Each structure stands twice: as structure tokens, then as C-alpha cells.
Amino acid sequence: MKKKRKIFGKIILITLIVLIVAAIAFSLFVYASLDKTVDINLLKRRDSSITRIFYYDFTDRKNRIGDAVELEDEAIFQSRSEWKSIYDLPQSLKNAFVAIEDKRFYDHKGVDWLRTAKATMNYLFRFDKGGYGGSTITQQLIKNVTGDNEVTPKRKLEEIFRAKNVEKFLGKNQILEAYLNVVYMSEGCYGVGAAAKLYFNKDVSELSLVECASLASIVQNPSKYDPFTHPENNKQRRKLVLKEMLDQQMIGEDEYNRSIDEEIILSEKIEENKSSGVFSWYTEALISDVCRDFAEKYNVKPEVARNLILKGGYDIYSLIDPRLQKEAEKVYHSYQAYIQNQNGTYPQSSCVILDPKTSDVLALVGGVGTKKGNLLFNRAISAKRPPGSVIKPLSVYSVGLEEGIFNYSTVFDDTPLEMEDGSLWPKNSPDRYRGLVPLCYALEHSINTVAVKALRHVGLDKSYDFLQKYGITLNEKDKCDASLALGQLTNGESLLNITNAYCAFANGGSMSKAKTYLYLTDSNGQILIKKDDEEKRILSRENAYIMTMMLKGVVDDGTASFINLKNSISTAGKTGTSSNNEDKWFVGYTPYYVCGVWTGYDTPTPLYYTKNPSCILFDKIMERAHVGLDLSNDFEEPFEILERDFCFDSGMLVGDNCNEDLRGSRALKGYFTYDNMPIELCNRHKSVYIDAYDGMILENPLLFWRKRRASLLEYTRNVPDEIHIEDSDYLIESRKRM
């Protein structure tokens, strides 16, 4: 019996030890997973209620040499935010908030354990359905700054550790000052300084005891205790505040009796704009970028970051070019002259201008017409639309060049592919098939069949990986011909990202991420965020130049040949159209700028134009952008580039037979590198004698006087008879007599 008891005791002991170890391990795991810190800089005083925006008057943008100039018209401010020193706040106000929100504020180290215990019991057993109410002023300050209001055990534990850490670095006066300046006071108002002006039209230092109690009443539920909208609720709550102040010996019986039934006189409610007015498209994108980066770096919610930035006290050093922004806006104000659809309606449009060497966003317009509000849908950065053929240089042509799979003159057969179900795909736009064409020509005329065939040489994985290097957002479903060769991306892509990717072509194969600003500083000049200027190389300088020459062909002789800018300065670019003609794109560049334009309806609807409207807008914008610049500037050709004449139909070096083609000389000039160029003469053109009357090949030309020498193509293809291939008449097989 004793032996059994000993064994049983050992089992219990071992079980307890295991449970204790498990509990400790679990506690350590939970502790390690908690975010226990909050950036102290977020809690410190902001001397200004204005966030200023600067631009740079660069003499050398690439090396960041230039002076910062304030954009006074773009200053950001909230009229209902005003930082007040703790020494400017009346004692009654400080006492009122402490009495009702955290009566042991001056005694605890960030956490009131008694209130926390009560709140925990309430959370577990729901004694009070109205809430849990265990947060100290320090904890509330952290919630106000981080925006983390989740009611979960994990969030509460994080809040506790954060509060204790804050109290290690800040004194009680600093904490109370920060809290009273950031706490939400209803009506879009933050802090007691702005609240005193709003509700009583007074400086906070002039507030009476009952007015102080009224402000302290708002905090628990701003919408419920708003003095303007719910004066009776506020009155009942401020009586409770005064009673707490009496019980905590912050006021005497006489003060309490005088104040308990005293009415407050509210100022007339004025509907104010919370900002300086309507921001430009650029400024709004800038604010969005700064807030996103701020939220990420300082671990706060995006809406909290936005509140902090809009409340003021920061300096943003933007990368805008005010002249270009103004010129782009002028074009979009006059949009009706450029983009009327054939059905008489006007679609939407957006544009982005980048510096190719730095990827600085110089100008940005998110919609047509005059911008009439804030937080509007910005189509330049937020619209995700299928890019169509604009993607081909990124996903196919540049990949094949860089990997040495093909070159400028590599020839593909422009014929449709037969799919498993017997259908022919893809179709070209317009619906024609030209036959043998070199890559440069296929890109100039946006030939879909060649893009798909070239992609299959490159491989889906390689194409997908390169697009990610370019910064294009992809879905696993995009590993298919339609997405990678024809631009029908599952989730679409933004104009900004597509335009940014083209910087790699314009900048010798390297690019950095597009950015609207360089620095965010506080009002004392301390840098809070610094944007990365680091470049990544995607293509060699030589292949980037070859891509530029191919894209220059698009503007000189291809789908964008009606662009007039090319007559003034070297211009390269690519058109794009999504399925059903629902999106029209053009991304182009000169030695100075990269500009992307998108046109379409917010709800995808077919577009009907004889000329791509995005090309027209690009032309108008870039014509204005280049005023005053040296237009003789050209794309810089690397020393290693070789220029050679090649045969259009074979991609090989031009031979004598290439000049006897019935269509005339088939020689084109191409751009190559030493290790990726044609080295043999054309062997596809064969010299034959044909009947001068009907053009058929003569088997025995010595016996036939009506003859002429010509070069025909030795090439065999298998396509359905109903498909007309334009170069079929120039194949040897088609000229043989039956």
C-alpha cells in the first residue's frame, strides 16, 4: 500500500513539474511574441500644428545637390489641433482628467493593477456590459498614438508592457502633457487646446472649473458626451467628474457646490475644414506614402499615422517638380479636347512622370478635370488594371535579351498557335498575320503571336521572376501565356508601378523604387524617415540600350508613330490595350523623363478610338515638359554596342539574295552585343528564276525566255488554309507549279 502511495506521489510530482515547466515555457513564448515597445518620439511635443512640404531646386538630382524650397500653397494643417505645454494648462483641467480617468495616476508605474484586475474579471464574466475600463492615462496615451484598440488579452498584455516602458523614459508631467494634447475630443478635434477654442472660444488657460470638467467628460465616449450634440449627457457626466474631484480632495465643498449646477456657455458651432483645402493629386499621394511608411516604421495603424501627420509638426521633403506638376494638371483640366470616346462620353485618365535616373515621382495626376476634394480615388497609384501589351518589353523581350535567348533580329513566325481544343490563339490586333518577322518589328507592331512564342522560349518561371525584379505585383495564377505575354494580369497593376519598371530601360538597366519624398523630419529637423535611393540592376547597359532602340521603333514606325514628340527629341515607348479595349496605355520616355498614361472607365467599358488617347495625352504632357530643355540630347549608346544590317526574314546578316526579294531590299539595321549577334549570312533567301508573267518558279529556266531572277524564302509552315499569312506568296513552296 505504501509502495503504491509513493508511486502515486511521484506521478503527481512529475505531473506538477511538467505543468509548471509547460506554463513557464508558454509564458516565455507569449512574452517573446508581444510587441512591448512604443517609439518615444511619437509621444513628444510638436511645436507646430502645420506640416510643411518642401521641394528641391536641384542642380544635380542624381547626386541630390540642390536647395529645399517650401511649397507654401501645399502646407498641411488641422485647425482643430494645437499643442499646449503642461505649464499652460490650468490645474483644474489636469485634476479633472486625472480624477475621472486615472485617480492613481501619480502613484502607479504605468499600470493600475487594481483596475486591471477588475477589468480582467469583467472581461471574463461580463459583469458590466458597457466595457472593461482598466486603462490608465499612460495606457490611453499609447492607444491614442498607436491606434491599437483591440480588446484582446494579447493586446492588453502588450499595452501593459508598453506603458511600463514609457514610464521608464518619461515623467508624469510629460505623459500627461502628451495625453492631453492627443486625446480625441469629438468634432474632429484633438487635444484640450483645440477643444477649448472649439467649445468655449477660449484659450485653455482661461477655462473655468466647470468647463474643465466638461472637457474631461468627453473622453470616455466622445460621440455620447459631445457638448454640442448631447449637452444633457455631458452635463450628467461632468457632475460625476466634479464629484470625483471632491472625493479625491482636488476641490473643496464650496467649489463643488458652486460648480455642480453651473451651466456652461458654448460657442457657436462652426463647421470648419479640417485641412488647408483641396490637396493636389501629388500632395495626396505624398501624404499617403508618408503615412504608410510612418505606420510601418513606428508600428502604428495607418489611420493613426495619418492623424499624426495631419495634426502637424512635421516637414516633408518631397521630390515633386512643381513646373511639371502644373503642366500635367493643365493638360488634364482640358481633357475634353483630347479623349472624347466615339460614343460621345469621356473616360477617366491618369499620368505619372518619373526621373529615369532616380525614379523620383516628378508629377502625378489621378483623374481628369479639376480636383474638387480630398481622399478621392487616385487612378495613378490605386487603380489596378490589366496593362495589355505594355508588359511585353518587361516580361518577354528584355528577358530574352538579357538571358541570351534571342536578340534584336531573331525571327519568329507570326502565325497563331493551335490549342488543345483545336482553336487558334492568340489573335492579333488588327486581325492579321504577317508571317516571318524579326523581334524588333514584332514589338513595334505589338504582334501577339510572336510575344507568346517568344515567351515560350523564355519560359514562364523566368518571365515571372523578371517581372518581380521590375517591381510588378503578381499572382501565382499569372504564370500563364495570357498574363505574361499579353498583359492580362489577374489583379492588374498600377500605372505608377508599370511606369517605374520602364525606368530600367531609360536608366541603363538599373532602377530604384519610385518615391514621392526623400525625408520626413520633425519640427526640430530630426530625421524620422529616410527613403532608400539604392538601385538594383536588372539588365546590362547594352541590353537596356537595345530595348530602348526597339521601343524607339514603336514611336518612329509602329503603333505610336503618330506621336509628334519624336520630331523634337528621341522618344521611345510602348502602347498597350487590354482585352475588349477596356484600357488604353502608353508608357514612354526621352533622355529626360519617363511618362506613363492610362485611359479607361472606372467601370471597365470598351473604348473606341482611331488613335490611342493615352498617346495623345502623353504627347501633350511631354511637349510641355520639354520646354526649355536641350532637345539635341539623345539616348546614350554604350561603347560595346554593335550596329549591323540584318535580313528581315531570317534575322541573319544581309546577303546578296536579300536584296532580290520581290518586295524590295529586306535589310534592316539592328543593335547587338558581341556575344549575342548574327554571324552568318542569310540562308533563307534562295535565288530562283520565275515566270515574269505569273511569278511561278521555272523548273527549266534555260528553255523559257519570259523569265526574271528573284529571291524567295525557303520556309515551310503548317497552318489551316482559312488563315491568310501575308508573306505566303513569297515562299518557294507557294510558287511551285502544281
State where each predicted segment sits.
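Low-complexity, Gly/Ser/Thr/Pro-rich intrinsically disordered linker/tail segments
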Residues: 644-738
